[in-house]
Amino acid sequence: MSVYNPNDADFAFTIGIEEEYQIVDPETRELRSYITQILEPGRTILREQIKPEMHQSIVEVGTRPCRTISEARAEIVRLRGAIAGLAARHNLRIVAAGTHPFSSWMQQEITPDERYRMVVGEMQEAALQLLIFGMHCHIGMPNNEVAIELMNVARYICPHLLALSTSSPFWMGRNTGFKSYRSVIFSTFPRTGIPPTFHSASEFERYVQLLINTGCIDNGKKIWWDLRPHPFFGTLEFRVCDIATKVEECLALAATMQALIVKFYTMFEENTTFRVYRRALINENKWRAQRWGLDGKLIDFGKRKEVEAKALVHEIVELVDDVVDMLGSRKEVEYLLTIVDQGTSADRQLRVFAETNDLKAVVDSLMNETIEGVPVMTFDTESSVQTAHS
């Protein structure tokens, strides 16, 4: 059982989290295209852990590979605190939400980089309006064959994770009626959504090579599925989620992804398995998740009936119950039940708007929740850390 123990040298199922934050002006509450001013001092402090994105109003961070969710907690808190502090030097704030409630993509500046120029050249307006913010979670894999086997099974759970993460109900000043409008916007890109199944790692590699040979992509990173084997990191990357507004929500999702992967792997080792369903069926659940979040019903394809999404979250917590203590993630996984009780970020945003009829109040709430429990770093003029405060 050493392969399942985070304290063992052979442990493979590490966690890596990437988050994409909004850079926001606290006076106007609009997005600000300010990544260049944040990036230079940010690289001094965070080195490769801070990156630009296509729009200059986005800043991306990534944790180091973590064996436990406790390590990931320390990383996420440190990274959010550092980025919040770097933004504060310019009287700016950060927000973790899948879309900005009212800022327009037409007012955003594109990062001057050849890679982004090529994306815009190919994707045109679909790229320009891709003003969305996600959370990606990498789970380490023992080898490529295991990655494909686990992807085939874990596809089924992607809509459930999306429902738990929803944080993008507004788009360009409108209530979209969706809990995750980010997912709708991203669907305009090719090679997105629920992945197909593959019989082996070699079949997947032949598929990628075919796309490269026919000029569709230059490498596997341009396969943007909700769940994919990362072409360079040796991980299975969950990409389905809106960015979680609160740190606790982020950690609950990441811990659940790790626990599910470990659970599925133990089932393989015990010669039991989880049924693999068609992409067309899983897509039905994904549409429901992005539309209604936890307030809707998802389809239990094994039982061939609709089930309240909230009830299915309880089933997920029960499914991984026998692995969470070994992984040290019981508290974080059980926080899913708090999300069920209190709602997602999308639910809270909609409540604030219902109470105030003011999208600026929604941004204020998001700014506060993004750094809830996070010590914000302060920096001197040379960008070295001075202090941190909550």
Swiss-Prot record:
Keywords: ATP-binding, Ligase, Nucleotide-binding. PANTHER family: GLUTAMATE--CYSTEINE LIGASE 2-RELATED. This is Putative glutamate--cysteine ligase 2. It catalyses: L-cysteine + L-glutamate + ATP = gamma-L-glutamyl-L-cysteine + ADP + phosphate + H(+). GO terms for molecular function: ATP binding; glutamate-cysteine ligase activity. One of its GO terms (biological process) is modified amino acid biosynthetic process. It comes from Chloroflexus aggregans (strain MD-66 / DSM 9485). Belongs to the glutamate--cysteine ligase type 2 family. YbdK subfamily. HAMAP family: Glu_cys_ligase_2. ATP-dependent carboxylate-amine ligase which exhibits weak glutamate--cysteine ligase activity. InterPro entries: GCL_type2/YbdK_subfam, GCS2, Gln_synth/guanido_kin_cat_dom, YbdK. Its EC number is 6.3.2.2. It comes from the Bacteria.
